[in-house]
């Protein structure tokens, strides 16, 4: 090596050392001024690995890449009687099963504790608030998040978060944009705290029709655009079928489209049954995925497992699986193993898992569910 080359190398090394010293100095100063964890290297941040909360429906967990992401904002919207509240009550039950604490901000004043208990919610330990104004509701949400003791907060619903000015005014007064301003301010305030605390916040929202829309979708959600931007996951839930036995209606078939997902591939679709008084049919979700992964075979109306017929018709097969828990648990274990390995699911209940690197995240989260 020539003398000139050695000088250049020494110059680069000394320059690199000076940069590292300057960087460590400024990082230390930032942490002293703003607290530990205010700035970090991405590779050192274990909290950047997104954990999930199960939705209670295996097909939807798969569509979301494991479930609702922890420490994020989630929006669930859809028409009336489509299963929005049921979906969140199942999430609350899942959190409580794992020893977590959940809160339900009932702005609509319509929570049914008997129905919640039938879905597996521990109503004795569920935190419930029925606020008078939108400001009060969002302030309660913010304080629950800041406490770092709550794992899940559900707000039902954004449309019912009425600004104080509107409540104190006369009926018929126009308070234009007040709810949108309220939501925009709230999202700016709570989003950072949500990420630090690891609390998941689910906002339920209603649909409205935009006036004068000739082309395109006239539907929109209430509360302005802030929630759409701040939400990491947005779920569009619809009722696509009413389930009947003869003339008796006993449930609905729901379809959920993942309209936005920042932590897994978006635009996946999941379907599942919601039974009146019982909630999401977990066995129905299992049967759908078992059929699509060829663990349970359907020929005509008959379903068979390992070459033996187990039921005629979907309803009878679900009943048979519920009565034979050992086989049901075995089928569930095989299904989760196949999905972890990336087996394609190609029918209506879940769009296919493509062979791409993003699905490694999904596989890891499904392992946690299993």
UniProtKB/Swiss-Prot annotation:
It is found in: Cytoplasm. PROSITE patterns: RECA_1 (PS00321), RECA_2 (PS50162), RECA_3 (PS50163). Can catalyze the hydrolysis of ATP in the presence of single-stranded DNA, the ATP-dependent uptake of single-stranded DNA by duplex DNA, and the ATP-dependent hybridization of homologous single-stranded DNAs. It interacts with LexA causing its activation and leading to its autocatalytic cleavage. Keywords: ATP-binding, Cytoplasm, DNA damage, DNA recombination, DNA repair, DNA-binding, Nucleotide-binding, SOS response. Residues 1-20 are annotated as: Disordered. Its main location: cytoplasm. Disulfide bonds: none annotated. Transmembrane segments: none annotated. It holds the Pfam family RecA. The keyword Transcription does not apply. GO terms for cellular component: cytosol. This is Protein RecA. Belongs to the RecA family. GO terms for molecular function: ATP binding; ATP hydrolysis activity; ATP-dependent DNA damage sensor activity; damaged DNA binding; single-stranded DNA binding. ATP binds at residues 78-85. The lineage of its organism: Bacteria, Bacillati, Cyanobacteriota, Cyanophyceae, Synechococcales. InterPro entries: AAA+_ATPase, DNA_recomb/repair_RecA, DNA_recomb/repair_RecA_CS, P-loop_NTPase, RecA-like_C, RecA-like_N, RecA_ATP-bd, RecA_C_sf. GO terms for biological process: DNA recombination; DNA repair; SOS response.
């Amino acid at each position: 090596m020539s003398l000139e080359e050695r000088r250049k190398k020494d110059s680069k090394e000394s320059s690199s050392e000076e940069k590292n010293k300057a960087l460590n100095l400024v990082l230390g100063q930032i942490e002293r001024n703003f607290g530990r964890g205010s700035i970090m290297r991405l590779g050192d941040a274990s909290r950047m690995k997104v954990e999930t909360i199960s939705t209670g429906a295996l097909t939807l967990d798969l569509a979301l890449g494991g479930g609702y992401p922890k420490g994020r904002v989630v929006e669930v919207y859809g028409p009336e009687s489509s299963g929005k509240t049921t979906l969140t009550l199942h999430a609350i039950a899942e959190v409580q099963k794992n020893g977590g604490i959940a809160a339900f901000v009932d702005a609509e004043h319509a929570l049914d504790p008997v129905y919640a208990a039938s879905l597996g919610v521990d109503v004795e330990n569920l935190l419930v608030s029925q606020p008078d104004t939108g400001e009060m509701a969002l302030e309660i949400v913010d304080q629950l998040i800041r406490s770092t003791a709550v794992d899940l907060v559900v707000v039902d619903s954004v449309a019912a978060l009425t600004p104080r000015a509107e409540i104190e005014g006369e009926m018929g007064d126009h308070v234009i944009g007040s709810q949108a301003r309220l939501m925009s301010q709230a999202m700016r305030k709570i989003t950072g705290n949500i990420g630090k605390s690891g609390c998941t916040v689910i906002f339920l929202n209603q649909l409205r029709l935009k006036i004068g829309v000739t082309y395109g979708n006239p539907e929109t959600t209430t509360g302005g655009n802030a929630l759409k931007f701040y939400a990491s996951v947005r779920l569009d839930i619809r009722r696509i079928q009413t389930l009947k036995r003869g003339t008796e209606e006993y449930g609905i078939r729901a379809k959920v489209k993942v309209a936005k997902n920042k932590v897994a591939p978006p635009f996946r679709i999941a379907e599942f049954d919601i039974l009146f008084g019982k909630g999401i049919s977990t066995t129905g979700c299992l049967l759908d995925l078992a059929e699509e992964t060829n663990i349970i075979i359907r020929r005509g109306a008959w379903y068979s497992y390992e070459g033996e017929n187990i039921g005629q018709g979907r309803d009878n097969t679900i009943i048979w699986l519920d009565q034979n828990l050992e086989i049901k648990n075995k089928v569930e274990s095989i299904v989760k193993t196949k999905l972890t390995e990336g087996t394609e699911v190609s029918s209506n209940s879940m769009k296919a898992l493509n062979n791409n690197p993003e699905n490694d995240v999904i596989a890891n989260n499904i392992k946690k569910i299993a």
